[in-house]
Design a protein with these regions (language model features):
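Hydrophobic, secondary-structure "cap" segments at the distal end of domains
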Residues: 75-76
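A generic short alpha-helical patch detector that favors 3-5-residue windows
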Residues: 27-28, 50, 86
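Aromatic-lined glycan-binding groove of carbohydrate-active enzymes
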Residues: 1-33, 68
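Glycine/threonine-rich phosphate-binding loop and adjacent beta-strand/alpha-helix elements that clamp
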Residues: 72
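Short Asp/Glu-rich motifs
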Residues: 23-25, 81, 96
Length: 147
């Protein structure tokens, strides 16, 4: 999809840039959100083991650069898209975003982060959009409600 967007000058603006906080926490580290966000668990828990390989590498590069995991994850993402959508609920979240803008990962570091990645199946709302739906004029996810 990234190649198509680049060729057609379409901006990619991914949401959940830190995978519900998973890319900002070391394996085993938790937070209130990680413990209580049922929707994020639905999206990410099935792939936790394979994702931890990437999370460990994000932590390793954060240590090497003397910065946060948030900064490393967002710095990588900014090499792939035009505008990641990030949220901040605490002041230190903004610091990580600022650090990401200043951090430049080498091509080798970017490849190191990407190497263990395995594509995930779509879940949640995105999984409702099927290939068959692509033929219709509009695709809506409205539950039982008519639009």
């Amino acid at each position: 999809m990234a190649k198509l967007c680049h060729e057609d000058n379409i901006a990619m603006t991914p949401y959940s840039a830190l995978a519900g906080g998973r890319l900002s926490k070391r394996p085993g580290e938790t937070s209130k959100r990680l413990a209580e966000d049922d929707y994020a668990r639905l999206k990410y828990d099935k792939t936790r083991e394979q994702d931890e390989a990437i999370i460990r590498r994000v932590a390793e590069l954060a240590d090497a650069h003397g910065t946060s995991m948030t900064a490393v994850a967002l710095a990588w993402l900014m090499t792939k898209v035009t505008a990641p959508v990030v949220g901040a609920t605490k002041p230190h979240h903004i610091e990580g975003m600022t650090q990401a803008v200043e951090l430049e990962l080498t091509p080798g570091e970017r490849a190191y982060l990407e190497e263990p990645y395995v594509p995930h199946a779509l879940v949640g709302v995105m999984a409702q959009n099927t290939a068959a739906d692509a033929q219709s004029a509009h695709v809506w996810s409205a539950g039982e409600q008519s639009i």
